[in-house]
């Protein structure tokens, strides 16, 4: 369970959390406007419905992070439209130095957040790191369908 940690004149979450907590105050101040203004393309939603079957998702994010503020609400709205069960997603809120007291990030090479990691049968299919290369929907389709995809920090 995430804990609320003082951070200047605000609080941040650290540890495992869920989207319900991120939609509540004070985080709703940044979550709601982006969520309400984003409309996923219906054709992408239909494609993602089948591609998301049996896929597990882990999200590393920061309630203090502007990139998380920009991407997370869109991610939630997209998954809701694709009828993916949000409650099964592992959401991990990190400190400003991108760590957790429980070391959830160990061995996962989390360098930038948000990081969305997609797994099938325990094998990583790919990840979207910090921001989408094309757009969130297109990047997810590429990762989940096995098309060539390099996230923004994959320079190999």
Predicted regions and their residues:
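N-terminal leader/targeting and pre-domain segments
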Residues: 1-52
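Conserved redox-active cysteine motifs that mediate thiol-disulfide chemistry
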Residues: 62-73
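Structural alpha/beta surface segment adjacent to cysteine/selenocysteine redox centers
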Residues: 100-112, 119
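Thiol-based oxidoreductase modules, predominantly thioredoxin-like and allied folds used
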Residues: 57-62, 84-101
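Non-catalytic, surface beta->alpha helical segment in thiol-disulfide oxidoreductase systems
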Residues: 2-17, 112, 117-156
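Extracytoplasmic/secreted cell-surface and envelope-processing proteins
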Residues: 68-69, 99-101, 126
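Sequence context surrounding c-type heme c attachment/ligation sites in exported
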Residues: 49-51, 73-76, 80, 86-94, ...
């Amino acid at each position: 369970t995430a804990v609320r940690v003082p951070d200047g004149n605000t609080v941040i979450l650290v540890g495992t959390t869920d989207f319900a907590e991120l939609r509540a105050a004070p985080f709703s101040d940044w979550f709601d406007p982006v969520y309400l203004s984003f409309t996923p393309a219906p054709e992408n939603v239909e494609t993602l419905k089948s591609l998301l079957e049996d896929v597990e998702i882990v999200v590393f994010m920061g309630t203090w992070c502007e990139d998380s503020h920009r991407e997370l609400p869109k991610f939630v709205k997209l998954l809701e439209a694709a009828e993916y069960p949000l409650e099964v997603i592992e959401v991990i809120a990190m400190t400003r130095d991108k760590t957790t007291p429980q070391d959830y990030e160990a061995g996962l090479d989390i360098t930038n957040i948000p990081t969305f990691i997609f797994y099938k049968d325990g094998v990583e299919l790919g990840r979207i790191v910090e921001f989408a290369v094309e757009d969130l929907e297109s990047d997810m389709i590429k990762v989940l369908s096995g098309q060539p995809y390099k996230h923004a920090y994959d320079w190999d």
